[in-house]
């Protein structure tokens, strides 16, 4: 199975890719290695999964529509696990444009390519921040998410 994992150099992305590779899947990793978190940490994570023969990595920002489309065209994945996003709740309040680009436009690029290339299965990893002003604890996937507090 060929699976794209976006945000592959992040903590969850690396562990997801590693699991899939150990299972025998082909993994196409995408990450922009931005400097919000230490890039050396991201590169160390990548080094750990680049040992696998069935791993291909693309250093690409998911906002880059043409490059994302080329990756889908070239690799012909069957599934996509979308974990890439600009991190940081506080940072999103100060820098909303970065979040609009990555977390909205980047998401749109990924989901449109999933539609255009007839991807069998799409998994989107989000954050508890989607529950926004919800006062119910613990959060549940059944709770309303119509009162966001930030773009994150």
Feature-to-residue mapping (PLM):
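N-terminal Rossmann-like NAD(P)+-binding domain of SDR-like oxidoreductases, especially those catalyzing
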Residues: 1-152
């Amino acid at each position: 199975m060929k699976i794209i994992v976006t945000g592959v150099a992040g903590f969850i992305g690396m562990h997801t890719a590693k699991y899939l590779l150990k299972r025998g899947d082909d993994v196409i990793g995408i990450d922009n290695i931005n400097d919000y978190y230490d890039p050396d940490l991201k590169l160390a994570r990548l080094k750990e999964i680049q040992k696998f023969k069935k791993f291909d990595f693309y250093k690409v920002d998911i906002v880059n529509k043409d490059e994302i489309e080329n990756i889908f065209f070239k690799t012909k994945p069957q599934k996509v696990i979308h974990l890439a996003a600009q991190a940081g709740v506080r940072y999103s309040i100060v820098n909303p444009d970065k979040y609009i680009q990555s977390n909205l436009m980047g998401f749109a690029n990924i989901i449109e390519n999933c539609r255009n290339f007839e991807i069998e299965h799409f998994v989107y990893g989000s954050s508890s921040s989607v529950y926004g002003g919800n006062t119910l604890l613990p959060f549940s996937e059944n709770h309303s998410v119509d009162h966001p507090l930030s773009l994150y």
